[in-house]
Amino acid sequence: MAFSLKGHVAVVTGNSAGLGKAIGVALGQAGAKVPVNFAHNEARGRWALEEYQQAGIETCLVQSDVTTEEGVDALFTAAEKQLGPVDILVPNATCDQPHRPIEEYDWAFYQSMLDFFIKSPFLLARRGLPAMRRKKWGRIINITSEVFHRSVAPFSAYVAAKGGQIGWSRSMSQELAPFGITVNMIAPGWIPVERHEKDPQAEKDAYLSLIPMGRWGVPKDIADAAVYLASEEAGFVTGQTICVNGGMTPW
């Protein structure tokens, strides 16, 4: 079954590279209009813009820091002006995620995690909800992580922030359901993308050995789940988490 997103506008944060780009392109190829956004790397943003355009996606380029209210407003204002009202939202932007013993973290790092995974989704949803409420239709798809479900260590800052994001998403799913707005989560496993190129091979081999399906996940695996959750066919699905990790969390 091919899911159609024609007539929709999807904001996917951090969609100039990695999982975000795969999700953005997949939503666009399903028919949605998708702005490309970047925080600092304009060259990468422009390269991604060309890739979206070559895929036949109606798009535009926006620079914005989605951990700030001003940045979120700039992204939505540009998207609304150039593409139309936003009714699909995928908070995906992330920061570095180093494994460290808790004694080696400081609060500033914990705060950066909370900014990306709780503050940013909150600001994005608050800005986007008026249009969704007017339409009585909307999709919010939070990109969480298997780390919360697996209690991965030493990774406390990331696990804590993702746990908060999951709780927020579940609560929002109940609050927004009467308005035809669904809130769901995709929890990827370790999906190697550009920023993992220098990760130690021994760590990669150890993780791969734990995956029941015996292969690495690829960005398309995550993107396909996002297209489904954004579709009409997922209209009666809300408050749910799809773990896309080859069977690492069988519950």
Question: Which residues are covered by each model-predicted region?
Answer:
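Residue(s) in the substrate-gating loop at a strand-loop-helix junction
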Residues: 145
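Conserved glycine-rich Rossmann-like NAD(P)H-binding loop of the short-chain dehydrogenase/reductase
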Residues: 32-47
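Active-site helix of classical SDR
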Residues: 125, 161, 169
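Conserved glycine-rich cofactor-binding loop
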Residues: 9, 16-18
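Substrate-binding pocket helix/loop in short-chain dehydrogenase/reductase
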Residues: 72, 94, 100-114, 196, ...
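Catalytic Tyr-X3-Lys loop
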Residues: 103-122, 137, 141, 158, ...
